[in-house]
Amino acid sequence: KLYGVPFGTAMAGGILYNRKIYQDLGLSVPKTWADFMANNAKVKASGKVAVAQTYRDTWTSQLFVLADYYNLHAAVPNFAADYTANKAKYAETPAAMKGFERLKDVHDAGLMNEDFGAASYDDGLRMVSTGEAAHYPMLSFAVSALKQNYPENLADVGFFAQPSDDAATNGLTVWMPPGLYIPATSQHAEEAKKFVDFAGSAPGASTESSAD
């Protein structure tokens, strides 16, 4: 049976970076956390902000943890199922604590903007797109806001996966899109089916993506 139709786009968690800064400083996209921190040290030495953080919008503070899930799953494949079943805990799983430790690493190395507690999500996008900052841990949906608010700088922004300690383990944390569903008790099932059919079609997907 068909229970639902995907609606929207998949989303990834990783790190936005300024391509111009990377080019000017001769940096390469890091494949390990050590490489990332070495890049940050060079950025800081150049006088730029290495990692933008924007805790005025508190949800942005979790990105180092969220984006590290690919690495957590690679190290402990059963963690999500065990965590859901209350058989595993973050504090007792070293691989799960890595994301929190990454945030501490960046803070303790003095790599953040001084106003990280007051800066907003849009401040972070501005900083990484205009070259005030080299990196901004973020979700890929930020492309829409960058396109809207900083279109002239959009091409200067790249995106890479949050590195692990092993270059052989390197990938994006991905969220699949939500779905549209029709209740069996709906009094307008036929109308709803027509809408869902359109939403799941190529024209419907194109319309939704272009408006996002």
Task: Label the model's feature ranges.
Residues K1-K31, M37, D57-T84, V174-I182:
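Periplasmic solute-binding protein
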Residues D24, A109, Q148-A211:
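Extracytoplasmic/periplasmic substrate-recognition and gating elements
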Residues D24-V29, K104-A118, E132, N149-V157:
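A local structural motif
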Residues K31-A38, D115-S129:
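Short helix-initiation/N-cap motifs at beta->coil->alpha
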Residues N40-K42, T84-F116:
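Glycine-centered hinge/linker elements that transmit conformational signals in sensory
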Residues S46-A50, S129-M138, A155:
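Alpha-to-beta junction loops
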Residues L72-K98, Q148-E152, A161-G171:
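Short, solvent-exposed loop/beta-turn-alpha elements that line the ligand-binding surface or hinge
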Residues Y121, M138-V143, M176-P178:
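Beta->alpha turn/N-cap motifs
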